[in-house]
Amino acid sequence: MRIGVIGAGQLGGTLATWCAESGHDVAVTSRHPERLREQVDRMNGKLRVMSVPQAAAFGEVVIFAPNWSGAKEAVDVTRSALEGKVVIDVTNPADGAPVAAGPGGAATGSHLTGASIKDPILVAAAINGPPSEAADRMLSHAGGKSGLETLIEWAPGAHWVKAFNTIPTDVLSRRRGHDPLLAEFVCTDERDAREAACRIIRDLGFAPFYAGGAKAARLTETGGPLQSREVDVRDATDALAEALAALR
């Protein structure tokens, strides 16, 4: 698979290297390509450095990994290239950055403060179903929107999916490929995006776990109850249910 990686920070650069090690053809963007020379040389042609528009055009799947402050600019210069493609969003809105307010209440960053979501009857009813469906039902009543939903508004022609945004790179490196596999929460409303993200997650040595649609990404982003949680895949169902219950 050809994978374009937009952003060669700690996470983006690491994912680019792992994808190349897993046999994918990878193009990564960087403002300082000389810093990637060692990784490029080591990958024997599987990893190359391109401009942001070039990497977006190169990838059959694109990993979107800029800093949140540069996310809008990155979308603006790649929107046409992303049309119809699966884009894996690994960003987190900056803590305290306004995302949007909805009728249920205000939201700051990924913090969920809508009053209706704290209704214990709603919480109890929601967690009785499959956790991923429960997340979608509960969060449809809350105010605000996830960073993923914001990206969807900016580039609606892309097939967006959230993954790789809950755990820091050092933990990913420590847990990669080791049993019990680390769960990687996946949030999307697009079937092809879910399938592509799950394939890459497995290729990189983790276990995909579907947490719900784009609204459910709020659970995994900055301030959400799944952010910074190191969860084994065998415990992922319970962790998602606990995350929903924590919103009371």
Range-by-range predicted roles:
Residues G102-G105, G109-G114, A125, G129-G144, ...:
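Short beta-strand and adjoining strand-loop segment in the mid-core
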